[in-house]
Swiss-Prot record:
Gene: Prss42
The keyword Ubl conjugation is assigned to this record: no
Domain Peptidase S1: start-end pairs: 79-315
Stated family: Belongs to the peptidase S1 family.
Alphabetized UniProt keyword annotations: Cell membrane, Cytoplasm, Differentiation, Disulfide bond, Glycoprotein, GPI-anchor, Hydrolase, Lipoprotein, Membrane, Protease, Serine protease, Signal, Spermatogenesis
Tissue-by-tissue expression: Testis-specific. Mainly detected in round spermatids at all the eminiferous epithelial stages (at protein level).
Pfam family, one: Trypsin
Functional note: Plays a role in spermatogenesis. Involved in germ cell survival during meiosis. Lacks protease activity in vitro.
Protein's UniProt keywords contain Nucleotidyltransferase: no
EC number(s) on file: 3.4.21.-
GO molecular function: serine-type endopeptidase activity
Name of the protein in question: Serine protease 42
């Protein structure tokens, strides 16, 4: 009927007049459409440094965490020392996979989003993630979920040095939180992690450099101390006799004694630090020179530095679909 069509047209017109929360963010992210170096053996760095325990300044009254999830950073298991991670210690840790093959780590930041490194992503490849199990092979408590959409930072580059090495993966469907599946907290831009903070890096990467490109079966954990990018840059320039700045803003480093580091296969995984009884992801495993070499810190993407980009991508992706769904629903009701 003509009157029904007119009403629908008016409703759609009014919807289009409404300000869209995502519009301001539309240029903040890009869908991954071009190839990037990735994979278990090809990651530019797959050799990042371990984390440290977060110490934060309390001068600000703003929340130190971004609102990606109503709950985050409080696993049911307590974190303790060791090499193999106990079941449920790091419930935000995920394995980013191609078919059944582990290629990189990642972290669950809410029920439908995973944070990883941009260098882990190739275009035109179907990825999935495995969540909920410390074993990279077994599926006792785990789920394998296809990736719906991939967002790589638009300024990601591997020219001279790796820059803007961060990406977001939207899952095909949300997961339910359990003792083995739980998101990590994401720091706000004002989150001031201090040098020397003790954090932990986790992953299924190589235990020793030069080992076969096969992931370790059981999730590994290693503690590291945070080094801010200025000091880290000087350390790596000295170690490599380079005059080029290798570590810049947007990066953070981790270092402990020789032999304690991330390695190939750990890329994209989290550097997690405890703050006020919550675990916050300070870094994303990005790159390094060899693994666990004395005087060579591992380099991570600084998550707090990119927090606005992260929230922009999630807002844009999550607000687009409800409007489309509403218009389609109205069409079906009036047809």
């Amino acid at each position: 009927m003509a009157s029904g069509g007119g009403s629908l047209g008016l409703i759609v017109f009014l919807l289009l007049l409404q300000p869209k929360p995502c519009e301001a963010w539309a240029a903040a992210s890009v869908l991954s459409t071009s190839g990037f170096p990735s994979g278990f053996s090809e990651a530019p760095r797959d050799n990042p440094p371990p984390p440290t325990r977060v110490r934060m300044s309390k001068a600000t009254t703003r929340s130190p965490f971004m609102n990606f999830s109503l709950v985050c950073g409080q696993p049911f298991m307590k974190i303790m020392g060791g090499v193999d991670a106990e079941e449920g210690k790091w419930p935000w840790q995920v394995s980013v996979r191609v078919r059944h093959m582990h290629v990189c780590g990642g972290s669950l930041i809410n029920s439908q989003w995973v944070l990883t490194a941009a260098h882990c992503i190739y275009s035109r490849i179907q990825y999935n993630v495995k969540v909920g199990d410390r074993s990279v092979y077994r599926q006792n408590t785990s789920l394998v979920i296809p990736i719906k959409t991939i967002f790589v930072h638009p300024k990601f580059s591997t020219t001279i040095v790796v820059k803007n090495d961060i990406a977001l993966l939207k899952l095909q469907h949300p997961v339910n939180f359990t003792t083995n599946i739980y998101p990590v907290c994401i720091p706000s831009e004002s989150f001031p992690v201090k040098a020397g903070t003790k954090c932990w890096v986790t992953g299924w990467g190589k235990l020793v450099p030069g080992a076969p490109d096969v992931p370790t079966e059981i999730l590994q954990e290693v503690d590291q101390n945070v080094i801010l990018y200025e000091e880290c840059n000087e350390m790596l320039k000295k170690a490599t006799s380079s005059s080029v700045d290798l570590v810049k803003r947007g990066m953070v480093c981790g270092y402990k004694e020789r032999g304690k580091d991330a390695c190939q296969g750990d890329s994209g995984g989290p550097m997690s630090c405890e703050f006020e009884n919550k675990w916050v992801q300070v870094g994303v495993v990005s790159w390094g020179i060899s693994c666990g070499r004395k005087g060579y810190p591992g380099v991570y993407t600084d998550v707090a530095f990119y927090s606005k980009w992260l929230i922009a991508v999630v807002n844009q992706a999550d607000c687009l679909h409800p409007v489309v769904f509403l218009v389609l629903l109205l069409c079906s009701l009036t047809s």
